């Protein structure tokens, strides 16, 4: 059995080791958090650069597509019947404008 006074240089550093481990884990956590934030920022920048190009290509493809597709999209967006989105609509535009102008004419019987 060893004599307790045999080696005087060793001391029980249980509390100091626990504190060092805690600091090391805290430092590792901060480093991982910074890396995650950098990755999220990089993904946001990549999306911000990709989305306008994607929209441009999509709009160019849509503009070069058939008018049938454009009519379907216009009917969906404006919630008008599909039949009302064709060339007849353009021809009837003047007639609708005239009926709207006639109905919005003020009557002379008003006070103002």
Swiss-Prot record:
Protein name: Putative movement protein
GO terms under cellular component: host cell plasma membrane; membrane
Record field: compositional bias (Polar residues): 98-112
Keywords associated with the record: Host cell membrane, Host membrane, Membrane, Transmembrane, Transmembrane helix, Transport, Viral movement protein
Lineage, top ranks: Viruses, Monodnaviria, Shotokuvirae, Cressdnaviricota, Arfiviricetes
Compartments (UniProt record): Host cell membrane
UniProt feature, compositional bias: Basic and acidic residues: 86-97
Entry's transmembrane regions: 27-47
UniProt GO BP: transport of virus in host, cell to cell
Topology relative to the membrane: Single-pass membrane protein
Annotated spans, Disordered: 80-112
Family: Belongs to the nanovirus movement protein family.
Function: May transport viral genome to neighboring plant cells directly through plasmosdesmata, without any budding. The movement protein allows efficient cell to cell propagation, by bypassing the host cell wall barrier.
Superkingdom to which the source organism belongs: Viruses
